[in-house]
Amino acid sequence: MEMVVVESSSGMVEEHTTHSLEDSVKILECNVAALREKTCHYENASLETFKKIGAYGIQIIKMQVTLGKTMIHDKHRWKSIEMWSAQIPRTWDDRLLILECLELLGTLYIELLHAQEIESKLLEERVNVDRPSGPLIRSIME
C-alpha cells in the first residue's frame, strides 16, 4: 500500500494556484484509495484500531513543504490534518531552515514506525490472535 504520496506542485519562482489545488486533491484521493484498499485487507479487524492508521502526503509548493495525514473518521467521512510544514532553504544564509525540514522527516519517520505497530495489531485481529472488540472494519464497508 502507498503510505506516502509526494507531489511537487509549483516551481520556485511562482505558484500556479490551480495546479497546487489539483495536486492537493490528488494527494487526498490517493490517500483515501490507499486506506480503502487496506480496509479490504483487514475487514475482520477492529474499526477502532483501524482509525489509528493513516496515509501520508507531502506537498511541495514553491519553497514550502507540507506533511499531511489522512485517516478514516466514520463510515462516510475521512479526515485530513496538516502535521508539519517547513520552508526549504535556498541559500547558505537560510541553512538553518533545514532543521524544519529534518523535523518534518523525523515526524514522518515516527508516524511510519507507529503505523507498523498498528499494522501488526490489525493482522493479529484479522487472524483472531487478538480478538477485536467493538465494530469491525467491514461494518463501514456495507
Where are these regions (language model features)?
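Extended catalytic cores and adjacent scaffolds of nucleotide/polyanion-binding enzymes
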Residues: 1-142
